Amino acid sequence: MTLRLFDTETRALRDFAPLAPGHASVYLCGATVQGDPHIGHVRSGVAFDVLRRWLLAHDYDVAFVRNVTDIEDKILNKAAEAGRPWWEWAATFERSFTWAYQQLGVLPPSVEPRATGHITQMVEMMQRLIDNGHAYAAGGDVYFDVRSYPRYGSLSGHKLDDVHQGESAGECKRDPRDFTLWKAEKPGEPSWPTPWGRGRPGWHLECSAMAEFYLGAAFDIHCGGLDLVFPHHENEIAQAKCAGDDFAQYWLHNGWVTMGGEKMSKSLGNVLSVPNVLKKVRPQELRYYLGSAHYRSMLEYSDTALDEGAAAYRRIESFVMRTQERAGEVTIGRWTDAFARALDDDLAVPAALAEVHGKVREGNIALDGGDLEGARAIASQVRAMLGILGVDPLDEHWTQETADASAATDALDVLVRAELERRQTARAEKNWAVADEVRDRLIRAGIEVTDTPNGPEWSLKAGQ
């Protein structure tokens, strides 16, 4: 395995050489749990899940950390607007994100730390920064002195002279570009004690402290969305380096999901929530779609593109399932060399999928020609490749989902048929009011009823 990854900091493809042979340490900036996840949020989870699976497939021991930002201005503001405690608001949407990742078959992280659980580590890092002359306390706040770090801007390419003032003007700042490590206590906001007064952490400090705590002063890969390069990741580097850490050796960033050429964003109002999209397609089809573009590319959303992605996945799935039906059990084999070359080339999933589809065409020819053993051998290869991409249709995650859905449908069938029998009885008695009331209630529940010569049949409306 010679895995090459595009490192944002050096702007070049680099051979992956872990700090410890056979071990890989990865930090992914997770969710700020201010609201329901949209498909732009979960793209990073899907993209870097493929990286993790590829490392695991090559027998790496992978420590994968994905944090939860559960204290932040937007969380506090939205909770206050809704009249709910901030911690309840954060916990509610943390569960929403966990559900979304689980639905899409994203492997759970090795650890998923919350910012509020690591205040001690943040205070310790701030103390080191102050002791090293890179931070200062003023008016209850603590600021990072950007001029004290000559390499500020190395990740993003921003020159310090071109950087505008930080997130707030801050009357106590030495330089308007200095950013906040710690925010002084405000009435009605949560706060924690520090040597510089009560307050709460700044967003950038949270990730640096948690990455160091779980992965050490130096670790292999830091991942996140392209929008995090500046200022978030730039500030993470500055904090960590000035606190004495070597920090991340590789920086990987995924592109956005866009609509009409604009980044999907709550502030723009152009978001598609994961639950709503899952009314249109199955979870594995959404995952396939989100993962089908190169992780560094922008993914322009449209209903047509989503439908095409779902149809492409169903063609692959159909081959695997038909083969298992006709040729017997399809075990997981070995991926092809072309597939491996694609993923080793900066996780080039489009090229990897081209190989998968080529194998599916080859397998369908074998299957239709009666070469069952040949078809089964190809299906085994396809399963291996799909497993790395997280969409193997015979994987327990997806088969259990199908079984659960089938059980739910069976239970629903019992209830609906009881209502249909009630409707049939009412019609036989010419009690049209009751018959219409049953029909209308089923329609409101998203159930369509078709009267056939063999009696009424029901189905869920599309998107239910």
UniProtKB/Swiss-Prot annotation:
Q: Where is this motif: 'KMSKS' region?
A: 263-267
Q: What is this protein called?
A: Cysteine--tRNA ligase
Query: What's the EC number here?
Result: 6.1.1.16
| Family membership noted in the UniProt record | Belongs to the class-I aminoacyl-tRNA synthetase family.
Record-annotated residues binding ATP? K266
Under the subunit heading, UniProt states: Monomer.
What's one Pfam family the UniProt record gives for this protein?
A: tRNA-synt_1e
Q: If you read the UniProt record, what top EC class would you report for this enzyme, in one word?
A: ligase
At which positions is Zn(2+) bound?
C29, C207, H232, E236
Q: Where in the cell is it found?
A: Cytoplasm
Using the UniProt record, give the first listed, main subcellular location. cytoplasm
An example GO BP is: cysteinyl-tRNA aminoacylation
Q: Cofactor stoichiometry and binding? A: Binds 1 zinc ion per subunit.
Required co-factor? Zn(2+)
Q: CDD domains from the entry?
A: CysRS_core (cd00672)
Q: Where is this motif: 'HIGH' region?
A: 31-41
The chemistry this enzyme catalyses reads:
tRNA(Cys) + L-cysteine + ATP = L-cysteinyl-tRNA(Cys) + AMP + diphosphate
